[in-house]
Amino acid sequence: MKEVELAGHKVRLYDSIDELPIVRFHKYNRFLLVDAGIGSDISDYDAHVERAIAYIRKGDTDNFAKEFENLRQNLFLIMSECSPKYLSFACLVESIDGKPQEDLSQEGLQKVLDLLGGASKKDVTEVLNSVKKKIDDELALYFPTLFDDVKTREYYDEVKRLTATLLAQIIDDTDRKSVIDDIREHLLLFSKPKRFSGKDGLEVVHDKEFATMCLLITKETGTEAKRMNVLEYYNAYDYIRQKARKAQNKAV
């Protein structure tokens, strides 16, 4: 557990996969998905507009439509002052001033944020980033085949290429504008927009996949999956995955 002081309150947060309940982790991830794909502030709005313009210029009407729909949802979240990023933080709060915080409904999580309303966004974001990094590092250490983020590495490889090209342009005094523009556009459109609304929206799919996996783990292990912590859940998931792979290899 991590203990911090926010807005004059003593806050205990789950920061380890051997303590964090899987149901909380699922909710936490769900809000992070929304924050990454939609966001809830003006900088996210600007990013949606920039990407939408880029898709129109490329004639990519399908991704433009998705981006525009996400922009509309972003505006709704801004106007309703509902932040998925801070709701993800609330999912990790175990207790405030010794009082357990067990209501994981959106209303319950919002009450946690209201109670800590005196804390600055900067302070909350710093705590969230610190805890998120620790959880991510533990998952990558224990389950490298499940949490090896290849896409993130590819993105930062492109950032390095952009930096190297900009430096080369300065050193060689050569015009590399077209190459630089291509890399910047690639970075801008690196992550394709996801659909969040409707029955096939990312949130619905995320919840359905979790429910299905919980049923499978409970059946295979005889233990209620939703009562597991993150470490136990992914140990079970990894075991089932390896078992299925061995059975498939034998069949061949």
Question: Model-predicted segments: where are they?
Answer:
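An amphipathic, hydrophobic-aromatic interaction surface with interspersed Lys/Arg
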Residues: 1-252
